[in-house]
């Protein structure tokens, strides 16, 4: 990972390790969870000095879903509540730089946009096996990491989401996602050691990685004998008309 980070940094690019663990969850699981969307959405609305229609609509919709079984006052009441809450949270954040607050305090302040018991019930009802405390702990750990490098709240939110970074993950973790361009690292026998024992499973993994790319996929290898170790996979690429480039 450090070698990859250094290589990307030479071109002004950052990496986001979606396999990094925060307690029981990976970063990928943290970033896609609805509890994260709620907490970070509220913080964005409170802190970032520009209109964020997507964040507003997404956060408002989440609040309505959390409160719907208990509150029948409708969208206008929820919108007024969110606007007032974001204004109060902005004051709270302005009174303390990130270096003077704890991640647990920030989570508590942002998540209090809805009733704690209602929020817990909502999260537990979304997916079988979801553990509210584990998700909460993971978000706090990620916030803590993001708050270490800066006292500016805008930078904290950017660091948390790492939106400008290139995500790196295993093929299996990429299921259900789609990217413009996918780069598969090291298509050779050393990284694909399990292929020899179970070629069909290896092909399935290969196609999972291939199908994540909406427009372009690049398979790399540093081994001059990679073709001989994975002949079936390279034959598929050849049949598809894939171009080969020697970068050395």
Give the location of each predicted region.
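Amphipathic alpha-helical
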Residues: 125-151
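A structural signal for well-ordered alpha-helical scaffolds and beta->alpha junctions
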Residues: 1, 132, 136, 202-203, ...
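Conserved beta-strand scaffold positions in the cores of enzyme catalytic domains, especially
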Residues: 15, 168, 244-245
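Residues that form generic nucleotide/phosphate-binding pockets
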Residues: 42, 62, 88, 92, ...
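ATPase/helicase motor core of nucleic-acid motors
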Residues: 1-125
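A short acidic (Asp/Glu
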Residues: 1-6, 179-180, 229
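C-terminal accessory regions
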Residues: 79-80, 88-96, 188-248
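Conserved helicase core region in the C-terminal RecA-like lobe
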Residues: 144-197, 201-212, 216-224
